């Protein structure tokens, strides 16, 4: 799709197949360095010529290294190319050392949803003190939008408008395809007749799987209504932490846990009729299993702001308990590794200083600002006969304090029983009398081939983390580290496993889909296809290919000296483009596509997800088809809503909303529709009002919050999931923001899954499989009821019914007099007019009880990379 925005600017929406081949006659940008080299080597003219480069032979220039045997290598430019549109970088080649005739020969498949006049190819020289622009080649958007192949030499011009040298140019080959002409987007991911899942990802789609979907940490029997499915089945509500506890208890060989936070004091089982393991903490359970001979490995994010040395304890900014958990397991057979979010070891100090928003980006910033955010539990479980298999749990739930909750989301009840020693509400200072912060999340269990892909992720990260640990111990004069702790499951005959292979350089070879680890047959009505996605780079894994052509073959991106897997964003883009009826999102954050914001377009939050959602709606408006997008987010990000970081995140969020409604309103006017933008896109949050229990202790001497007095508080939406057309579910640890989607910032893991026998394509009608049951179960929790009026989310009548309930709930939530809500769903407290203008509700510019602007405020004191 190509839409004219102004005389020169067009908005392109589709895929760009691009090949950056080579450049010619680049200038020597390192002349000063070359003069220094000659000065220092003048006295050693007879020295034996050597090749001092540590460069991959594939990274030589167009003429290779034919002169290297007779002459010392001349220091010259280290060129690379960035592909940019205004306020967004679309692609970046690797750096080629010392070459004025570089041959990159790199291919890119770029998802585009950007307005621009020219596509720019900036040729840069990588330097120890930062990159220098050699020059830029520009291709007009009109030429690209034609869809014709563009191939040839394009002049590289400097800032003066002239080439730095005569005939300086870059050779480019490209072709743009509008998204509505791409066949794979027409059927939906689940309805693809080729069943290839999301294309161009590191892990392929896996067949023969089983998935169990969870809402919240626990669901008590009878608290949610029965939901009928196809074939006479009834949706079964899972008990997440109880299932995880049972799986850990029954493990025979391995328990691997990855977390942003893992707290040894939490209890997984609290409200159950089965007494088993009810009184045992997570730490006690893991020690017990390790004493049975089970290999227990914990990989926890190392928060660099927390410390426990020389008797001085600093809990850290994020309060993850990492040092406390490490200390608890220190003298046990449980191996607990704290893993910092290091940048790539291939980046030098100055290479890590370059940042879109700040030149002061020292090496420690990566480890301080960004995190390991994945949440995974891997255990061996019972398979067919006497065999064992690998089972994975992934999603948004860390095994730590504040996460246990149920669909009731109590805020004042059971604080001394169910939530004893587990009170969590960071909105208020310690000691304040306040409601607990209820926690809503999504999680899942995976059995089958995809669970082994989660295992590959763990092993790649473990090898990298223990490599850093080994280096640290050597610096301290120690020589041993238990770096061979991973179970070699391929050597244990009764543990079913595909064949894992590695190249000599340690590169992981992703195994083919192996029927030996299938847990269901393809003709089984309850069969699942599952695919694993990640946001991660070579600074956090050991096993990525070292060469560009191998990375390209594994659908990884090369960015200067990094190899990047950003398949979570790829999955979101392709799934949104493939949606046919509706999209339902729950996410802790919602911001992106900053290149199209009304203000601060250079914030760097250039993930495509919000723009893709808006353009999906636009495409349906043009086709005169119904489509609806529902987005559930927290009322405010966790913490004090008056604080600078929270206010800035809220500001980015409101900028994102405004951009989306602008796009939709403009299209409605273009087709002369009298529809309202809210007929297509709506934002919601969750809240709770609960009367004080009769046995609540007196508040004598305590600072009492208004939230406590009014008996209300938001339900914190920590979920990271998307349901499309009731046939495809995408969930994991990734937020919808730049930190989670970039691949070079927070590390994330997610899964996309569907039942091939429960799709629109297979049924010829609205499917009612497990994904449908999951969405209806979530809506039953949020809306306080279920029924036929919620079966078709794309219908305008359904959308208006949801809005009626959510708007009434907002009125009840803010009423000074206690009034119980119907469910928990609340219309997000911003108003949108027919022109798409987003503004605060009259008399409610700040959050009730706690303050802070609902629309947020920009802060000049914070780096944008922290809050985007």
From Swiss-Prot:
PLD phosphodiesterase domain mapped to chain residues: 368-403, 713-740
Tissue occurrence: Expressed in roots, leaves, stems, siliques and flowers. Strongly expressed in the vascular tissues of cotyledons and leaves under dehydration stress conditions. Expression is higher in old leaves than in young leaves. Expressed in leaves and guard cells. The isoform 2 may not be present in siliques.
First-listed, main subcellular location of the protein, grouped into a coarse class: membrane
EC numbers, comma separated: 3.1.4.4
Induction section of the entry: By salt stress or dehydration, in vascular tissues of roots, cotyledons and leaves. Not induced cold stress. Up-regulated by abscisic acid in rosette leaves.
Cofactor: Ca(2+)
PROSITE patterns in alphabetical order: C2, PLD
Bilayer disposition of the protein: Peripheral membrane protein
Any one Gene Ontology BP term: positive regulation of abscisic acid-activated signaling pathway
Keywords: Calcium, Cell membrane, Hydrolase, Lipid degradation, Lipid metabolism, Membrane, Metal-binding, Repeat, Stress response
Phenotype caused by lack of the gene: No visible phenotype when grown under standard conditions. Loss of oleate-activated PLD activity and increased sensitivity to stress damage and to H(2)O(2)-induced cell death. Hypersensitivity to hyperosmotic stress. Impaired stomatal closure in response to nitric oxide donor. Attenuated lipid degradation retarding abscisic acid (ABA)-promoted leaf senescence. Decreased penetration resistance against non-host fungi. No effect on ABA-induced stomatal closure. Pldalpha1 and plddelta double mutants have a suppressed ABA-induced stomatal closure.
Manner of cofactor binding, per the entry note: Ca(2+). Requires millimolar level (PIP2-dependent).
Positions contributing to a 1,2-diacyl-sn-glycero-3-phosphate binding: 373, 588, 718
Domain C2 residues, every copy: 1-154
Paired cysteines (S-S): none
Molecular function in Gene Ontology: calcium ion binding; phospholipase D activity
Activity profile over pH: Optimum pH is between 6.0 and 7.0.
Protein location: Cell membrane
Catalytic site: 373, 375, 380, 718, 720, 725
Any one cellular-component term (Gene Ontology): plant-type vacuole
Matches recorded under InterPro entries: C2_dom, C2_domain_sf, PLipase_D/transphosphatidylase, PLipase_D_C, PLipase_D_fam, PLipase_D_pln
Role of this protein: Hydrolyzes glycerol-phospholipids at the terminal phosphodiesteric bond to generate phosphatidic acids (PA). May be involved in PA accumulation in the dehydration stress response and in the transduction of hormonal and environmental signals to the microtubules cytoskeleton. Prefers phosphatidylethanolamine to phosphatidylcholine as substrate. Involved in H(2)O(2) and abscisic acid (ABA)-induced stomatal closure. Involved in nitric oxide (NO) signaling during stomatal closure. Plays a positive role in ABA-promoted senescence. Involved in basal defense and nonhost resistance.
Assembly, per entry: Interacts with GAPC1 and GAPC2. Increased interaction in the presence of H(2)O(2).
Swiss-Prot/TrEMBL domain comment: C2 domain is a calcium-binding fold, and the binding promotes the protein association with membranes. In PLD delta, all the calcium-coordinating acidic amino acids are conserved.
Family listed: Belongs to the phospholipase D family. C2-PLD subfamily.
Record protein name field: Phospholipase D delta
Protein encoded by which gene: PLDDELTA
């Amino acid at each position: 799709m190509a839409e004219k925005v102004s005389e020169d600017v067009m908005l392109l929406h589709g895929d760009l197949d691009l090949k950056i081949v080579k450049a010619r006659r680049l200038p020597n940008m390192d002349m000063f360095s070359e003069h220094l080299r000659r000065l220092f080597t003048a006295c050693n003219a007879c020295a034996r010529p050597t090749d001092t480069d540590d460069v991959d032979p594939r990274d030589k220039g167009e003429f290779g290294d034919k002169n290297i045997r007779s002459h010392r290598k001349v220091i010259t430019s280290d060129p690379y190319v960035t592909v940019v549109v205004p306020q967004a970088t679309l692609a970046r080649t690797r750096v080629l050392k010392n070459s004025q005739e570089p041959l990159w020969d790199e291919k890119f498949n770029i998802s585009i949803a950007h307005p621009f006049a020219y596509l720019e190819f900036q040729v840069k020289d990588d330097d120890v003190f930062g990159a220098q622009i050699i020059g830029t080649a520009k291709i007009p958007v009109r030429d690209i939008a034609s869809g014709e192949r563009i191939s040839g030499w394009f002049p590289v011009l400097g800032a003066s408008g002239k080439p730095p040298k005569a005939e300086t140019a870059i050779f480019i080959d490209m072709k743009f395809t509008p998204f509505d002409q791409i066949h794979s987007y027409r059927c939906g991911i689940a309805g693809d007749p080729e069943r290839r899942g999301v294309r161009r990802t590191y892990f392929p789609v896996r067949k023969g799987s089983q998935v169990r979907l969870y809402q919240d940490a626990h669901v008590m029997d009878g608290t949610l209504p029965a939901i009928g499915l196809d074939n006479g089945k009834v949706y079964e509500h899972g008990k997440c932490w109880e299932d995880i506890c049972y799986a850990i208890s029954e493990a025979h060989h391995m328990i691997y846990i990855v977390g942003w936070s893992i707290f040894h004091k939490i209890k997984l089982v609290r409200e159950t009729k089965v007494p088993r393991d009810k009184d045992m903490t997570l730490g006690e359970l893991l020690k017990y299993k390790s004493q049975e001979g089970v290999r227990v490995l914990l990989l926890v994010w190392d928060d660099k702001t927390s410390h426990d040395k020389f008797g001085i304890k600093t809990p850290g900014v994020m309060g993850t308990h990492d040092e406390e958990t490490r200390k608890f397991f220190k003298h046990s057979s449980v191996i607990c590794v704290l893993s910092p979010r290091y940048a790539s070891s291939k980046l030098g100090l100055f290479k890590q200083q370059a940042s879109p928003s700040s030149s002061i980006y020292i090496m420690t910033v990566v480890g301080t600002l960004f995190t390991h955010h994945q949440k995974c539990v891997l255990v061996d479980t019972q398979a067919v006969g006497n065999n064992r298999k690998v089972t994975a749990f992934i999603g948004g739930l860390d095994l730590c304090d504040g996460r246990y909750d149920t669909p009731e989301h109590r805020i004042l009840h059971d604080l001394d029983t169910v939530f004893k020693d587990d009170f969590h509400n960071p909105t208020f200072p310690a000691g304040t009398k306040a409601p607990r912060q209820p926690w809503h999340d999504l999680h899942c269990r995976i059995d089958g081939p995809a669970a082994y892909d989660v295992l590959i992720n763990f092993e790649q990260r473990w090898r990298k983390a223990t490599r850093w640990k080994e280096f640290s111990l050597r610096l301290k004069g120690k020589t041993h580290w238990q770096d061979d702790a991973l179970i070699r499951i391929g050597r244990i005959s009764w543990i079913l496993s595909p064949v894992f292979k590695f190249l000599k350089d340690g590169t992981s070879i992703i195994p083919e889909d192996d029927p030996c680890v299938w847990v269901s047959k393809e003709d089984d009505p309850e069969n699942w296809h599952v695919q694993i996605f990640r946001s991660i780079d070579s600074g956090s894994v050991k096993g990525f290919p070292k060469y560009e052509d191998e990375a390209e073959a594994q659908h990884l991106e090369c960015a200067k000296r990094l190899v990047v897997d950003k398949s979570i964003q790829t999955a979101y883009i392709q799934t949104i483009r493939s949606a046919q009826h509706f999209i339902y999102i729950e996410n802790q954050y919602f911001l992106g596509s900053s290149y199209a914001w009304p203000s601060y377009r250079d914030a760097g939050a250039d993930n495509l997800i919000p723009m893709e959602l808006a353009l999906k709606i636009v495409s349906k408006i043009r086709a005169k088809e119904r489509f609806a997008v529902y987005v559930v987010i927290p009322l405010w990000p966790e913490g004090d809503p008056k604080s600078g970081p929270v206010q800035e995140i809220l500001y980015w969020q409101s900028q994102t909303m405004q951009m989306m409604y602008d796009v939709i309103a403009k299209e409605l006017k273009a087709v002369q529709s009298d529809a309202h933008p809210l007929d297509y896109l709506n934002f919601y949050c969750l809240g709770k009002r609960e009367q004080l229990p009769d046995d609540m202790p007196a508040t004598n001497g305590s600072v009492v919050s208004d939230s406590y007095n009014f008996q209300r508080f938001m339900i914190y939406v920590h979920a990271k999931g998307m349901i499309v057309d009731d046939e495809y579910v995408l969930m994991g640890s990734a937020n919808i923001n730049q930190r989670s989607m970039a691949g070079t910032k927070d590390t994330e893991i997610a899964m996309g899954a569907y039942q091939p026998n429960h799709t629109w394509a297979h049924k010829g009608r609205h499917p009612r499989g497990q994904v449908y049951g999951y969405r209806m179960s979530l809506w039953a929790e949020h809306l306080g009821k279920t029924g036929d009026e919620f079966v078709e989310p794309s219908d305008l009548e359904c959308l208006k019914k949801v809005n009626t309930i959510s708007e009434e709930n907002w009125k009840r939530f803010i009423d000074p007099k206690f009034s119980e809500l119907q469910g928990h769903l609340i219309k997000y407290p911003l108003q949108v007019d027919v022109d798409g203008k987003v503004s605060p509700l009259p008399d409610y510019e700040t959050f009730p009880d706690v303050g802070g602007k609902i629309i947020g405020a920009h802060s000049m004191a914070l780096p944008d990379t922290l809050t985007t």
